[in-house]
Amino acid sequence: MESNIILVVILGISIVGKATSVAISVAALLILKLLGLDKYIFPYLNDKGMFWGLVLLTAAILIPIAQGNVKAIDIKNNLVSFVGITALVLSFLTTYLSGVGLRYLTVQGHSDVMPSLILGSVAAAAFLGGVPVGPLITSGILALLVKMVKKS
């Protein structure tokens, strides 16, 4: 019962904070619990959910390439530019940090920090126009760095 209350609070905060992806996720979990399907679906989501979520996210990010909107010459030119090199370095760093974070939350057993992470994501979505999605963090950091470099 306590878990339902926590999820409802997170749902409310995510709705108020306009973090739609978080709200949909929480609502789906609550519905699964209410239908009694949690004992069947939660173990699979717990085990494979992150993987399949990343697969879908990666596929969505690769759509411009799949549609032919990004050509090989564009990639080549980008890879040798300041923005491209910075993107590679930041992607390397954030991917490494994501792995460290995932191990911290799962292997090291600090899943209790998840509500704070969700709240931070929701607050950033509500007040800063952010999007609570992992790989997009890299492009956000990149955009800020590029903006700083262009100002100087």
Curated annotation (Swiss-Prot):
Disulfide bonds: none annotated. It is a multi-pass membrane protein. It comes from Clostridium acetobutylicum (strain ATCC 824 / DSM 792 / JCM 1419 / IAM 19013 / LMG 5710 / NBRC 13948 / NRRL B-527 / VKM B-1787 / 2291 / W). Keywords: Cell membrane, Membrane, Transmembrane, Transmembrane helix. This is UPF0756 membrane protein CA_C0092. The chain crosses the membrane at residues 5-25, 50-70, 82-102, 117-137. InterPro entries: UPF0756_TM. The keyword Transmembrane helix applies. GO terms for cellular component: plasma membrane. Coiled coil: none annotated. It holds the Pfam family DUF441. Its main location: membrane. The keyword Protein biosynthesis does not apply. It is found in: Cell membrane. Belongs to the UPF0756 family. It comes from the Bacteria. HAMAP family: UPF0756 (MF_01874).
